[in-house]
């Protein structure tokens, strides 16, 4: 089962989603964490994070898995690292790449086959889980 939560920034989506997930025993996922994981990896691997074709290639290559405590990136659990100022600086640009969005959305859909989810984030109730 998947519960998708949409809404404007600052509306309490994350708080409600986390509380509901905990109460129901569901996995809580914020799709933004996956976009941040792609950006984090791009920053680790690229000398020029503005090279969008290279970011797309990294998104296709990196292994991303949703976990209860963060995102597993190439086998390593990442959480705090995904919120660095450098990730903050680039994540919006990287998340706008259509192929990156396809990859993130595919991972979210894959997770539904393994867990009950409460998920929030970009295009979640309109594109990913309409």
Regions found by a protein language model. Give the residues of each.
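Hydrophobic positions on the alpha1 helix immediately C-terminal to the Walker A/P-loop
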Residues: 16
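Alpha-helical residues within the helix-turn-helix
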Residues: 22
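ATP-dependent small-molecule kinase phosphotransfer cores
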Residues: 33-117, 123, 128
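Active-site signature of alpha/beta-hydrolase-fold catalytic machinery across serine-
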Residues: 19
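P-loop (Walker A) phosphate-binding loop of NTP-binding proteins
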Residues: 8
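Conserved lysine of the Walker
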Residues: 13
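Hydrophobic anchor at the beta1->P-loop junction of P-loop NTPases
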Residues: 3-5
């Amino acid at each position: 089962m998947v519960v998708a939560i949409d809404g404007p920034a600052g509306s309490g989506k994350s708080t409600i989603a986390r509380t509901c997930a905990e109460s129901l025993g569901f996995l809580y996922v914020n799709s933004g964490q996956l976009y941040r994981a792609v950006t984090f990896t791009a920053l680790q691997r690229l000398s020029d994070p503005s090279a969008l074709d290279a970011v797309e290639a990294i998104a296709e290559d990196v292994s991303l898995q949703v976990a209860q405590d963060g995102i597993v990136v190439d086998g390593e659990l990442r959480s705090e690292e995904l919120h660095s100022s450098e990730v903050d600086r680039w994540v919006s640009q990287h998340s706008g790449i259509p192929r990156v969005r396809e990859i993130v959305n595919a991972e979210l859909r894959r997770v539904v086959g393994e867990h009950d989810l409460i998920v929030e984030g970009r295009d979640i109730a309109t594109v990913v889980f309409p």
